[in-house]
């Protein structure tokens, strides 16, 4: 009887402990979402109300003035389309070059494999420099063209290493069976290896897309035509233009109003620039987890 009572008390303690752990895990999971929630809500709120009372879910305190100001600029849509084209084009080219380079390097019988790997690793530590890269892009006639954003950084050694590790993790018996069936190297690569490499290809695509989407420095250097500017560069210009100027220092009311609009525009641009990545990530989630785990098995 005593043992039964003790077991019941022990079970209750275990159940209570499990509930506490679950609540803790849920809170830790939701914690990273707080900054995102703050930015989204702040983009709809008057900065004066936000500073004085904090985040409010009362519709009376909300405003869409920041989004109206941003979308009233016709360059936003043009920059959004440009960023999509640059990001998709860059990501697709990066994935193709990475897997085409990684697969041969995953084969131990490749002549000069070690020296090629050393050469690639050296480029991770020593870059060509900004000025030589600019001169090369200029000599190739890519200045003020989309190719200046896509081509110079299309080869990423880290992506090649991830893809190589993934190919090394695939069973060698697949290749041996294909050779017995009469398949040549190209058939093995395109009909067997590429379909099996979908997880790592999606991971590399996501990495490249996010990196290019958030980039504005290359466009700032190589692009002078406003019609070719990506979204990040357009938003950067809008933020700079929305800041109070030196001529407003004497006009306190005008400066305060400009500061209020600048804060609204800042939060709105963060939401606009982050939205495509947030929408795209759930569709890549299953490939992302699988590709990362498989790509980390071998080096």
Where are the predicted features?
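A hydrophobic, multi-pass inner-membrane permease signature
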Residues: 2-299
């Amino acid at each position: 009887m005593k043992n039964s009572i003790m077991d019941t008390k022990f079970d209750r303690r275990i159940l209570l402990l499990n509930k506490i752990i679950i609540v803790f895990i849920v809170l830790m999971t939701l914690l990273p979402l707080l900054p995102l929630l703050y930015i989204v809500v702040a983009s709809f709120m008057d900065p004066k109300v936000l500073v004085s009372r904090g985040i409010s879910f009362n519709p009376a305190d909300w405003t869409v003035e920041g989004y109206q100001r941003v979308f009233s600029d016709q360059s936003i849509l043009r920059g959004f389309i440009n960023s999509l084209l640059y990001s998709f084009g860059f990501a697709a080219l990066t994935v193709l070059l990475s897997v085409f380079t990684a697969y041969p390097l995953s084969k131990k019988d490749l002549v000069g494999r070690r020296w090629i790997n050393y050469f690639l690793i050296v480029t991770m530590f020593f870059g060509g420099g900004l000025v030589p890269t600019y001169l090369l892009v200029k000599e190739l006639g890519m200045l003020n063209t989309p190719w200046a954003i896509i081509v110079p950084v299309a080869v990423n050694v880290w992506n090649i290493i991830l893809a190589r590790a993934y190919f090394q993790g695939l069973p060698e018996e697949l290749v041996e069976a294909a050779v017995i069936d009469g398949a040549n190297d190209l058939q093995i690569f395109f009909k067997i290896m590429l379909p099996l490499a979908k997880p790592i290809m999606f991971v590399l695509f996501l990495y490249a897309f996010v990196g290019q989407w958030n980039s504005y420095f290359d466009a700032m250097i190589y692009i002078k035509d406003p019609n070719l500017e990506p979204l990040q560069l357009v938003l950067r210009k809008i933020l700079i233009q929305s800041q109070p100027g030196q001529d407003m220092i004497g006009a306190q009311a005008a400066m305060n109003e400009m500061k209020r609009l600048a804060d609204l525009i800042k939060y709105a641009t963060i939401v606009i620039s982050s939205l495509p990545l947030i929408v795209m990530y759930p569709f890549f989630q299953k490939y992302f987890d699988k590709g990362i785990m498989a790509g980390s098995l071998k080096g």
